[in-house]
From Swiss-Prot:
InterPro entries: Pept_tRNA_hydro, Pept_tRNA_hydro_CS, Pept_tRNA_hydro_sf
Its EC number(s): 3.1.1.29
Subunit structure and binding partners: Monomer.
Catalysis: reaction(s): an N-acyl-L-alpha-aminoacyl-tRNA + H2O = an N-acyl-L-amino acid + a tRNA + H(+)
Family from the record: Belongs to the PTH family.
Keywords from the named record: Cytoplasm, Hydrolase, RNA-binding, tRNA-binding
Positions contributing to tRNA binding: Y14, Y64, N66, N112
Protein localization: Cytoplasm
Active site positions, chain numbering: H19 (proton acceptor)
Classification via PANTHER family: PEPTIDYL-TRNA HYDROLASE
Annotated site, Stabilizes the basic form of H active site to accept a proton, chain positions: D91
GO MF annotations, alphabetized: peptidyl-tRNA hydrolase activity; tRNA binding
Lineage: Bacteria, Bacillati, Bacillota, Clostridia, Eubacteriales
The name this protein goes by in its record: Peptidyl-tRNA hydrolase
Gene name of the encoded protein: pth
Length: 188
């Protein structure tokens, strides 16, 4: 079983913000693979299904970004998942819109959601897919909690299916395969 987690913040006011790109990817994958993400459990909302004949759980933690690790830890403990069976997708301000970066493991890189996950899991050896949301021109909080411009939103709508494909590559094969295929790609 593979856990696919999209990071974001709960609540209408955060929908379609840069910080909620992980939620957007989970919504896309749920629709594409006919997985109902509607069960409130493990401090989140989740659903089970199959991708590439592998059982997956899609999860959107409802703890707010900075406490995401609590939700993931509860689910991972319940299903006895290893860290490398958890894939996390989230926003990255160091990448331009249209770029993504897959990593097998690594530090939080200043992302509080990832910091919470590392603290709660007790390690950093879980694959992650970083989705570029562009660099802030001024205030970081306003940037990540702000909505995309109309032009950027149209661009991100082209990016989300590619992010989904990168995650499926990890599910099917592994993070290295996905890294080779998707790192460095610029989605126009």
């Amino acid at each position: 079983m593979i856990l696919i987690v999209g990071l974001g913040n709960p609540g209408k006011q955060y929908e379609q913000t840069r910080h909620n790109i992980g939620f957007d990817v989970i919504d896309y994958m749920a629709n594409k693979y006919n997985i109902d993400v509607n069960r409130e459990k493990f401090k989140g909302i989740c659903g089970e299904g199959f991708i590439e004949n592998k059982k997956v759980i899609l999860l959107k933690p409802l703890t707010y970004m900075n406490l995401s690790g609590e939700s993931i830890r509860e689910l991972a403990n319940f299903y006895k998942l290893e860290d490398d069976e958890i894939i996390v997708v989230y926003d990255d301000i160091s990448l331009d819109i249209g770029r993504l970066r897959i990593r097998e493991k690594g530090s939080a890189g200043g992302h509080n959601g990832i910091k919470s996950i590392i603290q709660n899991l007790g390690g950093d050896k879980f694959p992650r897919v970083k989705v570029g949301v562009g660099q802030p021109k001024d205030n970081l909080v306003n940037h990540v909690l702000g909505k995309f411009s109309k032009e950027d939103r149209e661009h991100i709508e082209k990016v989300i299916p590619v992010v989904s494909d990168a995650i499926v590559e990890i599910v099917k094969n592994d993070a290295k395969e996905s890294m080779n295929k998707f790192n460095g790609v610029n989605i126009e």
